[in-house]
């Protein structure tokens, strides 16, 4: 038996009614296959009723593992419900060879910082992918993703940060109630999962080498003060690129050096967080190393559309003769109608590129996905976990 995915969504006025409608649709799509994992996303005003949604989903799907989160917006099918109340359910049957392990991440304050516990200790190569729901009010996300890179090297980690937290401050859900964990993860093995990260940005101008810097501070690029080099680079751009930079100056940093050429998927894109005109240093939202290649990037609706379409086409090619069983999506709350001028942009693109397929996810306050084989936190990004049958 192969992997089967079912999904459902309902905008019913109560969490119980919405969960019932969504879970019934997911149950029908499974076609009698057992539910190994169910993911529940509870949105809008219904975030105060998560236990009711979980109870109903448990009754209808009887999943081996039940996890979820509250969210400010939901993705289901071809639609993105940016503001409305609703419940979305995603259910997977892993077939004869697949397996899933749900784990909790916890943090403890220690003398010199915060200790993280809960990352699974498994053999290298045993994990297909990890889905991660991160409560960043309690989880240091960058340090956590660095720990994943160390303990599960090369494993795609895809997920998001809840964009709406209930009044009690606990957005994560497990079993029949709220979880006190700082992060909830699902580790899959024995199946094939393709990650997708669309940062919605494209490189412009020349490649520049970091020649002095530490932490998140770049002091020199190509042997000159960084701010002077960036100013000269902007001045050398054509009029269209200079116009797009007015939306915000972004810098891409190569994750894996030593390649003959670098394309959009090789850079982790970050905004410039500050500058010191006196010293010529600039601050970026990521650690830098001397010798690292950097390049200016721009982000705009057309670039974001093209980037997502290109990434989807690559995943379609990568599936070969395999069938796509379903997908989980995590998109930024800065995308959607705010970026593109209309709703459903990303969901429609995913369905056009890979569908029709069972698609569920959440509009996030931060997205998680791999670049250059390492997990990163993102903004203004669409991340996707594509499950093959």
Language model features with spans:
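Small-residue-enriched flexible segments
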Residues: 1-51, 56-59, 63-65, 69-340, ...
């Amino acid at each position: 038996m192969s992997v089967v995915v079912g999904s459902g969504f309902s905008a019913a006025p109560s969490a119980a009614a919405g969960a019932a409608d969504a879970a019934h649709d997911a149950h029908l799509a499974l076609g009698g296959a057992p539910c190994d994992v169910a993911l529940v996303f509870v949105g809008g005003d219904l975030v105060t009723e998560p236990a009711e949604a979980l109870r109903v989903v448990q009754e209808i799907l009887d999943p081996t593992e039940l996890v979820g989160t509250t969210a400010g917006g939901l993705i289901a099918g071809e639609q993105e419900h940016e503001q409305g109340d609703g419940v979305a359910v995603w259910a997977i049957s892993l077939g004869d060879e697949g397996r899933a392990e749900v784990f909790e991440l916890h943090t403890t304050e220690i003398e010199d910082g915060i200790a993280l516990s809960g990352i699974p200790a498994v053999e290298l190569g045993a994990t297909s992918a990890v889905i991660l729901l991160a409560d960043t009010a309690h989880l240091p996300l960058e340090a956590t993703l660095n720990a994943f890179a160390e303990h599960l090297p090369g494993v795609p980690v895809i997920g998001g940060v809840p964009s709406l937290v209930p009044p009690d401050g606990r957005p994560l859900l497990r079993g029949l109630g709220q979880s006190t964990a700082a992060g909830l993860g699902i580790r899959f093995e024995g199946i094939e999962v393709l990650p997708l990260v669309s940062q919605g940005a494209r490189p412009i101008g020349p490649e520049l080498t970091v020649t002095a810097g530490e932490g998140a501070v770049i002091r020199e690029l190509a042997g000159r003060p960084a701010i002077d080099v960036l100013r000269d680079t902007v001045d050398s751009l054509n009029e269209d690129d200079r116009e797009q930079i007015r939306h915000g100056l972004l810098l891409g940093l190569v994750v894996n050096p030593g390649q003959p050429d670098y394309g959009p998927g090789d850079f982790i894109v970050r905004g410039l967080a500050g500058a010191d005109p006196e010293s010529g240093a600039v601050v970026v939202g990521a650690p830098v190393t001397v010798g690292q290649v950097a390049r200016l990037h721009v982000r705009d609706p057309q670039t974001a559309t093209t980037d997502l379409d290109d990434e989807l086409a690559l995943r379609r090619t990568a599936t070969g003769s395999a069938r796509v069983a379903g997908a989980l999506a995590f998109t930024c709350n800065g995308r959607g109608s705010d970026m593109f001028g209309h709703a459903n942009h990303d969901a429609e693109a995913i369905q056009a590129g890979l569908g029709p397929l069972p698609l569920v996810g959440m509009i996030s306050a931060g997205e998680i996905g791999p670049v250059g084989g390492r997990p990163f936190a993102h903004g203004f990004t669409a991340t996707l976990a594509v499950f093959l049958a």
